[in-house]
């Protein structure tokens, strides 16, 4: 195996976890844009579950919170560089 193959295998074998279940967070506050920026890419799109590692239940809550924050103007809908 080469060095590249070993690093790829390590990334693939890493166990993903839901940070909300681990920390015991039940409510995702849409009025906290700094927290919601962790789940949004540079263009303002919501990141998928496979990248963030959140469970389906909390991914739905995150997307709902991001959409609410966009609606009241705390997060932009589209931008060139958000981070």
Swiss-Prot record:
Keywords: Ribonucleoprotein, Ribosomal protein, RNA-binding, rRNA-binding
A GO biological-process term: translation
InterPro entries for the chain: Ribosomal_bS18, Ribosomal_bS18_CS, Ribosomal_bS18_sf
Molecular function in Gene Ontology: small ribosomal subunit rRNA binding; structural constituent of ribosome
A Pfam family it matches: Ribosomal_S18
SUPFAM superfamilies (alphabetical): Ribosomal protein S18
Transmembrane segments: none
Cross-referenced PROSITE patterns: RIBOSOMAL_S18
GO CC terms: cytosolic small ribosomal subunit
Domain of life assignment: Bacteria
Assembly mode: Part of the 30S ribosomal subunit. Forms a tight heterodimer with protein bS6.
Functional description taken from the UniProt entry: Binds as a heterodimer with protein bS6 to the central domain of the 16S rRNA, where it helps stabilize the platform of the 30S subunit.
UniProt similarity note: Belongs to the bacterial ribosomal protein bS18 family.
Protein name: Small ribosomal subunit protein bS18
């Amino acid at each position: 195996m080469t060095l590249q193959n070993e690093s790829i295998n390590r990334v693939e074998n890493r166990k993903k976890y839901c940070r909300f279940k681990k920390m015991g967070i039940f409510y995702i506050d849409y009025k906290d844009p700094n927290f919601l920026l962790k789940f949004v890419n540079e263009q303002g799109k919501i990141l998928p579950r496979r990248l963030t590692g959140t469970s389906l239940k909390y991914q739905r809550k995150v997307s709902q919170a991001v959409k609410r924050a966009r609606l009241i103007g705390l997060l932009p809908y589209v931008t060139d560089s958000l981070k």
